[in-house]
């Protein structure tokens, strides 16, 4: 990821500072004490008390993550799926049987896909989960059976291009959509819109 940099000569030169997680999103400098910095990055929050020479991480102390998206199945109780910045994809059960104001806390489990994945769940069988990962990786998984690390059996259903079509290109969060008329039909967005009639 991108490093955090500082200039001490008005922007003529820059130097990377800190040994911390990359991809920085926010930096706050205390207006009353410029030695005190708070940095928000893909790994969480880090704090410096000496203008960035040393940083204190809170990765194991703050239970926070950044979800890219959320999808859910049609079961009762239902499962919600999401991809998390730098932490892969997760799923959890949402039980509304006691009311919306009494949803019990649930531990998240591993889910198909990675940090930049979108999910589509078969409405006929909530154990069939499609994940479109970053840069065009598509898989179909059966989440009813997982290995010791919590990973579901999956098969790649990434579209294949002909020789004249070049390389398959996709976005960071490549879209995958299941037809509302026929759950066997999938649409995937790359440099072309792909359609599968048979679940990939």
Q: What name fits each language-model region?
A:
Residues 1-200:
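Beta-propeller blade termini and top-face loops
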């Amino acid at each position: 990821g991108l490093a955090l940099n500082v200039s001490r000569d008005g922007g003529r030169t820059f130097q990377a500072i800190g040994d911390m997680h990359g991809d920085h999103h926010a930096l706050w400098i205390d207006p009353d004490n410029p030695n005190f910095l708070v940095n928000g990055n893909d790994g969480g929050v880090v704090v410096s008390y000496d203008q960035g020479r040393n940083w204190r991480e809170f990765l194991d102390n703050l239970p926070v993550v950044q979800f890219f998206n959320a999808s859910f199945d049609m079961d009762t109780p239902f499962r919600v799926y999401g991809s998390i910045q730098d932490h892969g994809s997760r799923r959890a059960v949402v039980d509304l049987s006691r009311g919306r104001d009494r949803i019990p806390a649930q531990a998240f489990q591993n889910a198909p896909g990675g940090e930049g994945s979108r999910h589509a769940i078969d409405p006929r069988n909530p154990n069939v989960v499609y994940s479109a990962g970053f840069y065009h990786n598509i898989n179909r998984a059966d989440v009813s059976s997982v290995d010791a690390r919590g990973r579901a059996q999956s098969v790649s259903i990434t579209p294949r291009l002909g020789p004249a079509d070049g390389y398959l290109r996709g976005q960071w969060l490549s879209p995958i959509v299941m037809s509302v008329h026929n759950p066997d039909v999938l649409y995937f967005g790359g440099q072309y819109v792909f359609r599968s009639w048979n679940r990939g």
